[in-house]
Amino acid sequence: MKYKNGLKVFAMAALTASLCMPIHATDKEAEFDLYASVYDYGARVNKVVCELPEEVLMDSIQKDTFRVVSDNKSTINLEVDNGERTIEDIYVSDSKDGERQNFGNYIIIELETNLNTQYSDVLQWDDPSFSNAPLQVEYKVEQVKPMRTTEEKETLYTWKQDEFKQELVDDFTEGESHGIHYRDYKPEEDGNKHPLIIWLHGAGEGGLNNVTHINGNKGAVAFVSEEAKEVFDAPYVLAPQSSDYWMPELELGDLVLKGTDVTKDLVACIRDYMDQNQGIDPTRVYIGGCSMGGYQTWEALFEAPDLFAAAFPICAAYEVPADKMEALKDIPLWIIHSENDSTIPVQYSRDAYENFKKAGGQATYIEYPNVQVEGQDYESHAVWVYPLNNETKDEEGTTFFQWLASQKKEEQTTNWMPLIVVTLVVAGAIFFMKRKK
């Protein structure tokens, strides 16, 4: 009997304790931001940052406290493959980009992101049109376990997405000139002249959205990394987008891509951009691109050889005419291709290099046997990952960034001597005529 009474007392005490435990209601709302970065294989969502109105303890949070699920929407009326993301790490901080702390009002959720990670894309591939389109990036975050605050209260929230932010990409502004849409990065004005780097995207990143070409690979953002800013002395970066394809036509097996020749408009766009940004050093204008962007690099050089200090066509989709090389012989080139490229024959770049040398040009040619990053095989055409990560070096050990940053045209100065001679001759003739009278 005493035993039963003891159980009753214990049960009542436990019930009273549980009722007194301060548990916050689940209808409390808080917001999270999504973050994405551009990798060798394109832009991927890699982080969630949750902001709380109260501080929570780090030791009350584990990976299984949250579920993160992509809920992206197509902008081209295609079905989207969504699903749960793998949480790689989770920690508490005192700011959105802060370090791990014992307590704070920000929860940083780092998501697994690699070449084969599912549901992480910010672009959607459309095979029939051979092009990417931007996704409407949306995620759902669910808190499945309560957390403890610094006041030792358990708290549970309903989470709502706020902003979608992209590292480096958000540092670019957008514009349009001569019918060419572009993204661009401008360094802070400091009264000095800075180089201009022009990046031309490949097939599949064209359109009128002004976003896929900057998210498809590191093409533009590579040149605004901290390393690039230091090597290039804070460059301007211009990333134009073709409305469809740079090339009028390209055959890829049974697939025929038909585009529009906008070379004259592109060059006009570049000149206009330089006129609008007086901080650009006209003796340090560099142009390059990959695949179809490599083709457009060559065409821009032929259209305006006086404009560029150096160029870097990468795995260019172009059998470059040998008889046109003479006009480019004074422009240093860095040409890159992979030997096993199954999209564009490596012979295109080999021939371009040899013909350029025969015309008297100076070029660095780098050929990789394949494309492999950290032991993982990439698509054989994607040789641009090496120069964009500044991992390409010439025989002397000079990196691609170092080589490009060292190129400079001779400043164009006006030769006044012929005018002075003519002026003196005319003045002398007038003086002689007056004396004769």
Q: Which residues are covered by each model-predicted region?
A:
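A domain-start/cap signature at the N-terminus of enzymes
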Residues: 26-51, 62, 70-194, 410-411, ...
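The conserved beta1-alpha1 loop
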Residues: 200-202, 337-338
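Primarily recognizes the serine-hydrolase "nucleophile elbow" in alpha/beta-hydrolase
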Residues: 274-327
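C-terminal membrane-anchoring or membrane-association module
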Residues: 427-437
